[in-house]
Amino acid sequence: MSIGLLCCVAFSLLWAGPVNAGVTQTPKFHILKTGQSMTLQCAQDMNHGYLSWYRQDPGMGLRRIHYSVAAGITDKGEVPDGYNVSRSNTEDFPLRLESAAPSQTSVYFCASSY
């Protein structure tokens, strides 16, 4: 199999320590082959209503993927294609990548606010 056929999507995530973290993302780093799926976890312990997932591509600013204003309410951001989210409670806001593509190689951020 040639190296050209084996495309990988690399995910690099900011990660805060477990003590007084505020927002925690896991896993910290992840590499996927094209077509693989995975879930990025985002947990916050500040009882914030607003949670957002962003991606930052090389040389670009942040672009919002999906966001939520409260548990059970989610909406699409600027670049939602290829991603799904859910929010069943205030604390958790996982981002699901259904089928990795090289164009999704990026740094991913989860953020919370009031």
From Swiss-Prot:
It comes from the Eukaryota. Glycans are attached at N84. PROSITE patterns: IG_LIKE. Keywords: Adaptive immunity, Cell membrane, Disulfide bond, Glycoprotein, Immunity, Immunoglobulin domain, Membrane, Receptor, Signal, T cell receptor. Residues 22-114 form the Ig-like domain. Residues 1-21 form the signal peptide. One of its GO terms (biological process) is cell surface receptor signaling pathway. Pfam families: V-set. Disulfide bonds join C42-C110. GO terms for cellular component: plasma membrane; T cell receptor complex. It is found in: Cell membrane. V region of the variable domain of T cell receptor (TR) beta chain that participates in the antigen recognition. Alpha-beta T cell receptors are antigen specific receptors which are essential to the immune response and are present on the cell surface of T lymphocytes. Recognize peptide-major histocompatibility (MH) (pMH) complexes that are displayed by antigen presenting cells (APC), a prerequisite for efficient T cell adaptive immunity against pathogens. PANTHER family: T CELL RECEPTOR BETA VARIABLE 6-8-RELATED, T-CELL RECEPTOR BETA CHAIN. Alpha-beta TR is a heterodimer composed of an alpha and beta chain; disulfide-linked. The alpha-beta TR is associated with the transmembrane signaling CD3 coreceptor proteins to form the TR-CD3 (TcR or TCR). The assembly of alpha-beta TR heterodimers with CD3 occurs in the endoplasmic reticulum where a single alpha-beta TR heterodimer associates with one CD3D-CD3E heterodimer, one CD3G-CD3E heterodimer and one CD247 homodimer forming a stable octameric structure. CD3D-CD3E and CD3G-CD3E heterodimers preferentially associate with TR alpha and TR beta chains, respectively. This is T cell receptor beta variable 6-9.
